Amino acid sequence: LYPNFRSLSIVNQDVFTITIGNPALLFKNGKVVYKEENEKVFYDSMDFWNDKEGLVVGDSMDGCISILITRDGGESWKKLDCSIFNKRLPNEGFFAASDTNISIVGNRAWIASGGINSRIYYSEDIGKSWKIIETPIIQGESTKGIFSIDFYDNKNGFAIGGDYTKPLENISNK
């Protein structure tokens, strides 16, 4: 087994990495702390609110996006139940190439999706509840949507994207 690492986070003295593909493996300091086996499993990005609480986001499987949450410093991870995303859309995914589709400021988190449907998943309470925000960014095909998101504070942020097959086009991409 040769892991293909997608995301890296360092929290205090702990190093977290996650792989893409089947099986998905999440490591803490070289030890597997979460494993998921599924033909469609693909985790894209990881970030932490603090030294105890963090999240990992992955592409949709069976019509539900994949979000993992830890509340114990990464010793264990729990996949959020799909029912909390009551407005989920089919074929919604995340762009893994950038590892910048999560932004965390204080207790808040923004997760930018892309592809057929490109929206922002927003939590203001360390991932305990989520709102879904529609965006005007170009979308509708698997190559379009938000590629990266970042917030400076609770009210000021920026999302960019477009269509990665048409890098010279500058239409509805920010």
Describe the role of every protein-language-model region.
Residues 1-174:
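Residue-level hotspots at or immediately adjacent to binding/recognition sites across diverse folds
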